[in-house]
């Protein structure tokens, strides 16, 4: 539906994997020591991406209905772990949950269109494939993470996919 969500938003996952992740977060909350959960978006990084492979195979996701893509570069994933560990070691409090995504939730079609242009794959040559069944089609907000003092090296998919 494209609505925005953050760590305070209600979570009612329909998929098995989403339900399993929520159950794991509940176990983390029960842990008697300091702990937090990190909800990573779609992780990508160096090397060939699944999206580029899909484009090279002649397929692009449908333009409609728009499916929101929340991504995070693998380098930023590691940096988030280090940031939160340093906060803990410095005696600073941690929130119970962080959304770890970049600052630009974007319709997947736009991401794939940008990647096709970057990789010189003519859009006219692409056929619409199946819609993505992943994720909940929400715009995940990373304000809690940024408010903790973290700064993204790759604030959007454009910086992340350009650094290849």
Regions from the language model: what does each represent?
Residues 24-46:
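Conserved beta-loop-beta element that borders a ligand/cofactor-binding pocket
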Residues 52-64, 121-125:
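A short C-terminal helix-loop "cap" of Rossmann-like NAD(P)-dependent dehydrogenase/epimerase domains
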Residues 80-83, 87-131:
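Mid/C-terminal beta-alpha module of Rossmann-like enzyme folds, strongest
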Residues 133-164:
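C-terminal amphipathic/interface module of NAD(P)-dependent oxidoreductases
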Residues 77, 81, 100, 111, ...:
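Non-catalytic, hydrophobic alpha-helical segments
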Residues 16-28, 74:
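Conserved catalytic Lys-bearing alpha helix of Rossmann-like short-chain dehydrogenase/reductases
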Residues 1-15:
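Active-site "gating" loop of Rossmann-like NAD(P)-dependent oxidoreductase/epimerase domains
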Residues 19, 37, 43, 48-53, ...:
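Substrate-positioning beta->alpha
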